[in-house]
């Protein structure tokens, strides 16, 4: 709702309240409307958050293009939302061809997203959904692909200048049977430890932090993923 409309609605509500009071004796009207714009309710609140991912626009039936006008409309809507934090998830496998990292593959989509965040000072949590980063059945991590993932984010931050990327989310919902980790904490932690080393080797120590597990938790029985990550991974996650 635009601020002007919100202000009008607030005034209308106050007028209705005062009108109701006017219909009664002054002694019976003790309602007080107070707006405190100075007190901070929660200092940890940083604002709205958005999930905004780049997707392939070719599904085998012709490529779909996003026009400049469409991008402008999207930007305008985001400006209205004023997000302070945006999660951007990709698949490293999408930028690897014939075993080599192809940094420019799909960049025309990703650049619009990161460009918006960089220009507006929005903090980005970049990440990989987890596909092929590990083999839960074999209990192994794909170090080659993790190397590519680290090199890719280092290129985005260093060469392309997207230092809005402050965090990295390795594997979506690792506690789930549907995830690449298949609920195996030790396997996920092994990948996190290795990847942290690769980020540091790429010069991202102190620049990009690995986040704890974005575990899908619907009850207290899965909360141990967070506490165990804190206890066992320490400063490898930030």
Q: Where are the language model's segments positioned?
A:
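N-terminal amphipathic/basic-hydrophobic helices that include classical n-h-c signal peptides
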Residues: 1-2, 168
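Sec-dependent signal peptide recognition
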Residues: 4-12
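Hydrophobic h-region of N-terminal signal peptides that target proteins for export
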Residues: 12-22
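Non-catalytic accessory regions flanking glycosidase/transglycosidase catalytic cores in CAZymes
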Residues: 21-167, 176, 182, 186-220, ...
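Active-site neighborhood of divalent metal-dependent phosphoester/pyrophosphate hydrolases
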Residues: 171-172
């Amino acid at each position: 709702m635009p601020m002007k409309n919100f202000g009008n609605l607030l005034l209308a509500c106050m007028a209705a309240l005062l009108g109701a009071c006017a219909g009664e004796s002054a002694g019976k009207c003790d309602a007080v409307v107070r707006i405190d714009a100075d007190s901070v309710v929660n200092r940890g609140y940083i604002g709205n958050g958005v999930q905004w991912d780049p997707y392939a626009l070719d599904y085998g039936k012709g490529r779909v293009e996003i026009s400049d006008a469409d991008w402008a409309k999207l930007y305008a809507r985001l400006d209205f939302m004023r997000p302070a934090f945006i999660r951007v998830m990709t698949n490293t496998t999408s930028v690897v061809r014939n075993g080599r990292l192809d940094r420019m593959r799909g960049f025309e989509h990703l650049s619009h997203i990161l460009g918006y965040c960089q220009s507006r000072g929005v903090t980005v949590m970049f990440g990989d959904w987890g596909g092929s980063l590990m083999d839960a059945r074999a209990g192994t991590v794909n170090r080659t692909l993790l190397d590519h993932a680290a090199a890719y984010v280092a290129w985005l931050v260093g060469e392309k200048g997207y230092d809005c990327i402050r965090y990295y989310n390795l594997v979506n919902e690792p506690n789930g049977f549907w995830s690449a980790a298949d609920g195996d904490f030790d396997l996920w932690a092994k990948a996190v430890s290795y990847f942290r080393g690769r980020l540091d080797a790429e010069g991202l120590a102190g620049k990009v932090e690995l986040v704890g597990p974005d575990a899908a938790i619907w009850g207290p029985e899965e909360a141990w993923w967070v506490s165990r990550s804190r206890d066992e991974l320490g400063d490898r996650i930030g």
